[in-house]
């Protein structure tokens, strides 16, 4: 067979094999033409999934009469004039193949009118008959394209079409994609005479979120994180899935480059890497729009324009990664601050929450010890630690880099930072030995309300060096460690509450830990035990979400403590004594002042009070006093 130039109709049908895959492909090409023409409204009508009829109506600029026939010719376009234009293309179409290819496999009617024309004109082409007839018609400014009987002259192609429902699904999915990136356009879709989609123009962020909810679901729109980043000619905007969302957000994954939906492995890798700590191995939902200089991206690398090539791919990858990581960090900080504000506001309305974080200040003045340098000789209460526990655990588990602030909470312990808590002191008794003046003091109460509440309690022993109670037993003095007393008071409290079940306290921010394959079964088998301890644990998207814990675990590193606990109870159900010991060990000390510790001790039954007080160690005070006097 000799080499020859193909007839135009045959060449168009071959090209249609690339351009026209199914009805959704026709709609894509025609709607993109409408958008390139500046339309602000596009109405789509289809019958039988698009195989019977596809009709696109827009209010764009229209096509002049003398160009109607040319519009249906192959390689005819208004988008390009030179190779330089191709390097900086911003329009959807530019090859001039769509209308010619569609008209070669359907009965196509193109009706259009420009603002300058007094009447509209209509062009008609059918299958292999490439001659185009142009006649007058009635039509407002804009264009209407009808493609009837798709693949009527290529039975083999028609047999490959799926059911009407399947073809409609493909059309609907494509419309969702374009509706998100061109939110200023009013889109409607009718199927078999019934309107099924109506995407109204979105000119504000609130309106865009409504469209986002229409397309991607309310769960994603309500929990999505806003992304908006600009740097050195690159701009990334849109929404990403919140790593703390508890609801399924679907499989929304749309990425646009200069308004064009693309599928790119580089982009997907950057998104997965940004979420590596939060949702390991899971699909991430996102709607992201990247804008950059069109000279820096090549869109002419795929027949359907689904792929692009970035001239500086590594730079684009790093920009996307850093923009998403920044959005995740900022959202974590805002979530923490909002949760903290809520907790402070609700502190007097919910007994199930611990008291809010607060910074204590020293109160010197009239309550200073009148011996030597008061600032150096005054006795301070036991050290306190800032409430970093749960925040640090959440930060390590979720990859958040929240700027820590110096705030104090209850108790002292070994994890997290340690701070110094200052409280006012009262003058010692005049009858006290002078050598005790620098060592002993009774902590003052921070408010009149506390004084009223504690007025019925027996007098608290004096505090020695901020670490011990000094107890008098007849002619003997005994020292009781405040940390030891705090642990024992906590132990008795847990023992009293555990049988009825502990009350879980919501965390400021849920802690997420990568799940182990055996945890699901463990949670099912030990459900009653987990509830009894006040724990609320759920498994979602390959992550264990820690939502509530008893107050005794608030200061622990939950990201490691809870997995160790699940591993412990996996093979055996612990005894009550073992659970109590575990909670006590994890709790640290739940008191930030000797006065509160004393109030807690006095709230126990008298027998338990005596058990704890009996732990004090006798101090040979006569020997100690003799040593001090001899000096």
Swiss-Prot record:
GO annotation terms (biological process): mismatch repair
Signal sequence coordinates: none
Top-level taxon of origin: Bacteria
Alphabetized InterPro entries for the sequence: DNA_mismatch_repair_CS (IPR014762), DNA_mismatch_repair_MutL (IPR020667), DNA_mismatch_S5_2-like (IPR013507), HATPase_C_sf (IPR036890), MutL/Mlh/PMS (IPR002099), MutL/Mlh/Pms-like (IPR038973), MutL_C (IPR014790), MutL_C_regsub (IPR042121)
Record-linked PANTHER family: DNA MISMATCH REPAIR PROTEIN MLH, PMS, MUTL (PTHR10073), DNA MISMATCH REPAIR PROTEIN MLH1 (PTHR10073:SF12)
Entry similarity comment: Belongs to the DNA mismatch repair MutL/HexB family.
NCBIfam families cross-referenced by the UniProt entry: mutl, PRK00095.1-1
Function: This protein is involved in the repair of mismatches in DNA. It is required for dam-dependent methyl-directed DNA mismatch repair. May act as a 'molecular matchmaker', a protein that promotes the formation of a stable complex between two or more DNA-binding proteins in an ATP-dependent manner without itself being part of a final effector complex.
Protein name as annotated: DNA mismatch repair protein MutL
Source organism per UniProt: Shewanella loihica (strain ATCC BAA-1088 / PV-4)
This protein's encoding gene: mutL
């Amino acid at each position: 067979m000799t080499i020859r130039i193909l007839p135009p109709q045959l060449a168009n049908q071959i090209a249609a094999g690339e351009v026209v895959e199914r009805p959704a492909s026709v709609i894509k090409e025609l709607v993109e033409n409408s958008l390139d023409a500046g339309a602000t409204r596009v109405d789509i009508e289809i019958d039988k999934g698009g195989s019977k009829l596809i009709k696109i109506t827009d209010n764009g600029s229209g096509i002049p009469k003398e160009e109607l026939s040319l519009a249906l010719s192959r390689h005819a376009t208004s988008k390009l004039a030179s190779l330089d234009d191709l390097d900086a293309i911003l329009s959807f179409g530019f090859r001039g193949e769509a209308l010619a290819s569609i008209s070669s496999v359907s009965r196509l009617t193109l009706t259009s009118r420009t603002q300058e024309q007094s009447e509209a004109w209509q062009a008609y082409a059918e299958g292999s008959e490439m001659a185009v007839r142009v006649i007058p018609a009635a039509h407002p400014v804009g264009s209407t394209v009808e493609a009837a009987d798709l693949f009527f002259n290529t039975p083999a192609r028609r047999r490959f079409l799926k059911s009407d429902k399947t073809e409609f699904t493909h059309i609907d999915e494509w419309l969702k994609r374009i509706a998100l990136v061109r939110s200023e356009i009013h889109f409607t879709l009718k199927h078999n005479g019934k309107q099924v989609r109506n995407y109204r123009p979105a000119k504000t962020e609130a309106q865009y979120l409504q469209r986002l909810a229409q397309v991607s679901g309310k769960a994603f729109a309500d929990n999505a994180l806003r992304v908006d980043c600009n740097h050195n000619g690159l701009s990334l905007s849109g929404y990403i899935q919140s790593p703390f969302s508890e609801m399924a957000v679907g499989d929304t994954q749309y990425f646009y480059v200069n308004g064009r939906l693309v599928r790119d492995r580089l982009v997907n890798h950057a998104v997965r890497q940004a979420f590596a700590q939060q949702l390991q191995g899971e699909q991430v939902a996102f709607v992201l729009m990247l804008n950059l200089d069109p000279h820096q991206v090549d869109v002419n690398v795929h027949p359907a324009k689904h792929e692009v090539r970035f001239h500086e791919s590594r730079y684009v990858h790093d920009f996307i990664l850093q923009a998403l990581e920044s959005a995740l960090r900022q959202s974590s900080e805002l979530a923490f601050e909002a949760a903290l504000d809520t907790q402070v506001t609700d502190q007097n309305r919910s007994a199930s929450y611990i008291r809010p974080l607060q910074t204590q200040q020293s109160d010197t003045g009239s309550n200073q010890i009148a011996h030597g340098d008061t600032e150096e000789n005054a006795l301070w209460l036991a050290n306190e630690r800032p409430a970093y526990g749960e925040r640090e655990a959440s930060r390590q588990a979720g990859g958040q880099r929240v700027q820590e602030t110096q705030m104090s909470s209850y108790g002292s312990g070994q994890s997290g930072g340690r701070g110094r808590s200052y409280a006012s002191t009262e003058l010692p008794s005049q009858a006290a030995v002078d050598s005790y003046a620098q060592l002993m003091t009774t902590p003052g109460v921070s408010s009149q309300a506390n004084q009223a509440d504690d007025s019925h309690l027996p007098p608290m022993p004096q505090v020695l060096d901020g670490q011990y109670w000094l107890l008098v037993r007849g002619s003997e003095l005994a020292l009781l460690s405040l940390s030891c007393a705090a642990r024992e008071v906590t132990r008795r409290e847990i023992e009293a509450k555990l049988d009825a079940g502990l009350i879980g306290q919501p965390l400021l921010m849920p802690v997420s830990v990568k799940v182990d394959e055996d945890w699901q079964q463990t949670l099912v088998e030990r459900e009653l035990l987990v509830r009894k301890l006040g724990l609320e644990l759920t498994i979602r998207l390959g992550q264990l979400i820690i939502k509530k814990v008893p107050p005794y675990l608030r200061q622990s590193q939950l990201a490691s403590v809870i997995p160790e606990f699940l591993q412990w109870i996996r093979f055996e159900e612990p005894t009550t004594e073992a659970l109590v010991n575990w909670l006590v060990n994890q709790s640290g000390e739940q008191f930030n002042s000797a006065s509160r510790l004393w109030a807690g001790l006095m709230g126990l039954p008298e027998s338990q009070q005596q058990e704890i007080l009996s732990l004090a160690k006798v101090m040979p005070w006569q020997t100690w006093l003799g040593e001090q006097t001899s000096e």
